[in-house]
Regions:
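Non-catalytic terminal accessory segments
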Residues: 1-136
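Soluble catalytic domains of enzymes that build or remodel membrane lipids, polysaccharides, and related
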Residues: 142-398
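Canonical alpha-helical transmembrane segment with a positive-inside/aromatic-interface signature
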Residues: 111-153, 167-169, 178-180
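Hydrophobic, well-ordered secondary-structure segments
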Residues: 107, 119-122, 138, 184, ...
């Protein structure tokens, strides 16, 4: 039997064992997800084996890490550094690289040598860097007088003479193999060190690995307790998988969770009315209309809405969000932002605002790129974000 045949049998057999383990340990839906992902990844890996055969021991090791990583999710927990370094990160790198190499696998299927297939893995290697490292930045957002007919991108504008509202937004950290407790803790420490007026957390704190114990998220967010009274949060879709754990961890860090609630905060900028919207899969228009009726605008207060999913921005009643802060999309996670182009997977295939500054009417939306990873194995071309937002109000607040 040839080396290629042995690799093919081993890859597809290991994938089948992982799916069986996933079904027994976590149920049918997770097994289907893993089965689809590993089937696609495995077929591409097998198709490209002959091209990479000169380095087959490395290629086989990387394929094994993919299967081991997804098998470990059957008993999901935060793994030690040695496991992440030798299994999880290599496995996610190889899974991303092989899926990015799909065009070369198609070429190979037609009997053409897939020249330059290694480029997909160079891109995936850069994706690892973008997934585990963030660069601090400062962003000016001007709330201007313009009235915009429909949801669309909007210029950030320029800084004004008046003192801006200073906000640090943390969103979608997704504690897991690419976001350790230590890394999220450092992000929180740097947020506190910037001495913002507000720190706003817009959801999706966990992955399957970090749902094992509340102490994981508690330890990660602990530095935020230093700014008690200035730190608020709303829930994301993944937070509903372990709501009691998330609530407990936020309370431990002195973070006030707003679930369809408001908070009024006095800041050096002036009074701010904060609205925290719960995440809803259905009935979002009715939900946001009811929330706006329950908490009408307070005169003279800047109205800031924490809304995890930017796709719901269009359902917010008009003039009810001077500034809406969202996450959820991870900035598109796959895109060309690194090359200076605005296109991402989300913007190409959906109408959902994916990253940056948007407008509708006089309402403004900022979509944070997030710090973590979920879904596709890595960030590719869309760097994580760790920013200080300086909000310049250049119009009268009702």
């Amino acid at each position: 039997m040839s080396l290629e045949s042995l690799f093919s049998l081993a890859t597809l057999g290991a994938g089948l064992l992982v799916v069986i383990g996933a079904a027994l340990a976590r149920g049918r839906l997770f097994a289907i997800f893993v089965g689809v992902l590993l089937t696609i990844q495995g077929l591409i890996s097998v198709a490209l084996f002959d091209y990479f055969e000169p380095i087959w021991p490395i290629y086989a090791y990387l394929q094994a890490t993919v299967d081991l990583h997804f098998l470990s999710l059957a008993r999901a927990r935060m793994r030690p550094l040695w496991w992440r370094a030798t299994v999880s990160v290599p496995g996610l790198f190889f899974a991303a690289g092989t899926m990015l190499a799909l065009p070369w696998a198609v070429v190979d299927a037609f009997g053409v040598t897939p020249h330059f297939a290694w480029l997909a893995f160079v891109v995936a290697a850069w994706g690892v860097v973008q997934s585990i490292w963030t660069r601090e930045e400062e962003i000016d957002l001007a709330l201007d007088e313009a009235t915009i007919e429909r949801v669309r991108r909007h210029p950030r504008g320029k800084a004004g003479d008046k003192r801006p509202l200073r906000i640090v937004q943390i969103t979608d950290p997704h504690l897991g193999p690419l976001m350790s407790v230590a890394r999220l803790r450092r992000i929180c420490e740097r947020a506190v060190a910037r001495e913002p007026d507000l720190i706003l957390l817009t959801g999706d704190f966990l992955t399957m690995e970090s749902q094992a114990a509340a102490s994981i998220l508690e330890d990660s967010l602990a530095p935020l307790a230093a700014l008690e009274g200035k730190v608020f949060a709303c829930l994301g879709n993944h937070d509903h998988e372990a709501p009691l754990l998330v609530r407990s961890a936020l309370a431990s860090a002195k973070v006030r969770l707003l679930v369809d609630e408001e908070a009024v905060v006095e800041t050096p900028f002036g009074p701010v009315q904060l609205i925290g919207a719960d995440f809803k899969f259905r009935g979002r228009k009715a939900h946001l209309e009811a929330l706006s009726r329950a908490y009408p605008r307070r005169p003279g207060h800047l109205r800031v809405v924490m809304l995890h999913d930017p796709g719901a921005f269009r359902h917010l009643p008009a003039d009810h969000g001077d500034l809406v802060l969202s996450g959820h999309t991870h900035g598109g996670q796959l895109g060309l932002l690194t090359l200076g182009l605005p296109w991402t997977f989300v913007s190409v295939f959906t109408p959902i605002p994916d990253h940056g500054f948007w407008a509708r009417g006089k309402d403004r939306l900022y979509v944070h790129r997030g710090t973590g990873v979920y879904g596709f194995p890595l960030r590719v071309g869309v760097p994580a974000e760790e920013s200080l937002l300086r909000v310049h109000v250049q119009r009268e607040v009702p």
